[in-house]
Curated annotation (Swiss-Prot):
Protein name from the UniProt record: Phenolic glucoside malonyltransferase 1
Organism the protein comes from: Arabidopsis thaliana
Active site, renumbered: H169, D413
GO biological process, one term: response to toxic substance
A Pfam family matched in the record: Transferase
Residue numbers covered by motif DFGWG motif: 413-417
Gene field: PMAT1
Enzyme Commission code: 2.3.1.-, 2.3.1.116
A GO molecular-function annotation: O-malonyltransferase activity
């Protein structure tokens, strides 16, 4: 994934093992995967890079202050989140994988130095996404075991540093990941191990009810999905924990971040109201749900489909993750550890719908209806979602969302201020758009895109022109 030229911009100083602190870490812990975890167990890991601007970041300061503080606080935080130091395994006689932590298990913590241009990686102009890859630590995954998470901290001398997280999606969802990062940041900044109740993880798996045997249905669906990737052949090892094949990303794939202000979003809201009232298309019986998510996602996916261009009859689809904690009956605690995320997908669409004059409005109607239809039954549809990918037409453009404006990633202060930029690197592995709250806390939305250069040029133009009109 990382070529020699990129590797030369990075010097690895140390690769350490960080173990959880305190006496609790002397106890073993086993957590079975739930059906929510199994939805994600073959998908690519989630890679985040959090940049901090710090012109005082000399190598001596990095070595003597930043790295020791991060390692000590990481060890302390892991004592509350023991499964992160453990491994994902699938024993021969077990019906499904489980997370196992045993004393002396540890996370990998890489310390590195980069001569890359910090301001370019955190700036507003598009740049090759492969420039981010040296900053992301490897995550060990083999047939019989997988690490839960790995970390890397990289110095950009006299510019700043970044903290990178590579997280296995079967172990934790975005909510759990950001809860852990908030715990780590708080511990590092305050130099104490106290955590408020909302950051203390809940490990009780009985809060996830499975009366429909979704576990088995999801594993069977994954078996059929795997056969699509092997040309119809039976997988050699049905219990392999190796992730699905991911595409090789070349130097022609570019990364771009768009900041939509609250005013931009309001402008798009008014445009949808106006288009809806004067639309030639028969109105939906339901009123449009013009939430920030509906507006922003509809706008982004419309621009992405237009940027791809091509045959208007080509197949497209869209989807987004759904946090089910509050949808479940009874509700699942907000600090539940693991995955409590399903997904909503709408397939069998054509590009023509979005490329037309009223494409933005058509997208908003569909996304609005998708959001309005969400209830506790969204979890029951997981096997159906996976089955849908076995019959997908080749070349279908399927757009999705990574992250959320609710995670509060720009509040991750480890003691050196707010992040300069937070990047979800793993959107390269699928046509995903990353979502985060705006850095300035003004109610805007930050979107991340990853596209081939020629499409990115068109996309940037479409995104900005749409806001001008």
């Amino acid at each position: 994934m990382v070529n020699e030229e990129m590797e030369s911009s990075l010097k690895v100083i140390d690769v350490a093992r960080v173990t959880p602190s305190n006496s609790d870490s002397s106890e073993s812990l086993t957590l079975p995967l739930t059906f929510f975890d199994l939805l994600w167990y073959k998908l690519h890991a989630v890679e985040r890079v959090i940049f901090y601007k710090l012109t005082d970041a000399s190598r001596p300061f990095f070595d003597s202050v930043i790295v020791p503080n991060l390692k000590t606080s990481l060890s302390s935080s892991l004592s509350h989140y023991l499964p992160l130091a453990g491994k994902l395994v699938w024993e021969p006689l077990d019906p499904k994988p489980k997370i196992v932590y045993t004393p002396n298990d540890a996370v990998s913590f890489t310390v590195a130095e980069s001569n890359a241009d910090f301001s370019r990686l955190t700036g507003k102009e598009p740049f090759p996404t492969t420039e981010l890859y040296p900053l992301v630590p490897e995550l060990h995954v083999s047939d019989d075991s997988a690490s839960a998470v790995s970390f890397q901290v990289t110095l950009f001398p006299n510019q700043g540093f970044c903290i990178s997280v590579n997280a296995h999606h079967a172990v934790l969802d975005g909510k759990t990941t950001t809860n852990f990062l908030k715990s780590w940041a708080r511990t590092c900044k305050n130099q104490d191990s106290f955590l408020p109740q909302d950051l203390i993880p809940v490990y009780d798996r009985t809060v996830i009810k499975d009366p429909m045997d979704l576990d088995t249905k999801i594993l069977n669906a994954w078996h059929r999905v795997a056969k699509v990737f092997t040309g119809g052949k039976e997988p050699e090892n049905p219990k392999s924990l190796k992730l699905l094949w991911s595409p090789e990303i070349g130097p022609d794939v570019f990364r771009y971040t768009l900041n939509l202000t609250r005013e931009d979003i309001q402008k798009l809201r008014e445009r949808l109201k106006k288009e809806s009232s004067s639309s030639s298309v028969s109105s939906s019986p339901k009123e449009l749900r013009l939430s920030t998510f509906v507006i922003v996602y509809s706008y982004a996916l419309t621009c992405l489909i237009k940027a791809r261009g091509g045959d208007p009859s080509r197949p497209v689809g869209y989807g987004f993750a759904v946090d089910c904690r509050s949808l479940m009956v009874p509700p699942v605690p907000s600090s539940y550890f693991g995955n409590c995320v399903s997904a909503c997908f709408k397939m069998s669409l054509t590009a023509e719908t979005f490329m037309s004059e009223e494409g933005f409005l058509a997208a908003a109607r569909m996304v609005s209806d998708s959001v309005e239809a969400l209830d506790e039954n969204v979890a029951l549809k997981i096997p159906e979602i996976l089955e849908g990918f076995t019959t997908l037409s080749p070349g279908t453009q399927v757009l999705s969302v990574a992250g959320s404006t609710r995670f509060g990633v720009y509040g991750l202060d480890f003691g050196w201020g707010r992040p300069e930029k937070v990047v979800v690197v793993s959107i390269d592995q699928g046509e995903a758009i990353s979502f985060a709250e705006s850095r300035d806390g003004s109610g805007g939305v930050e979107l991340g895109f990853s596209l081939k250069k020629h499409e990115m040029d068109v996309l940037v133009d479409l995104l900005h022109k749409g806001l001008e009109n």
